[in-house]
């Protein structure tokens, strides 16, 4: 997958109409080729809790060079929450420390998406 739109198009059919928040990671090899998708958290209508270790452990086990965080907002509102902003910062920082590059965090809502990279937040 070469862009955030590619991730959106892959994950959107699974996430856009759900009634609860789901957080996934897309794992990438050193050439940024898609390795695997893993669901790391299932939440409620308006919250989904995720800790950096839930992202990094699978990334390490699968020998991923990089990862993308993909989540849905069941409300359809693409505005990142304070929790979204904080976890993005923590994951980016943790990834740099252990050599797992965070390439983006996208939020899917309805038929659209928000990219932290495209909005200059990562």
Model feature map: region roles:
Residues 1-5:
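Long, charged amphipathic helices and adjacent flexible linkers at domain junctions
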Residues 6-9, 13, 27-31, 41-122:
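Active-site-proximal loop/helix of nucleotide/amide-processing enzymes and allied scaffolds
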Residues 16-19:
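Short loop/turn motifs at secondary-structure junctions and domain boundaries
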Residues 22-25:
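Short glycine-rich loop/turn motifs
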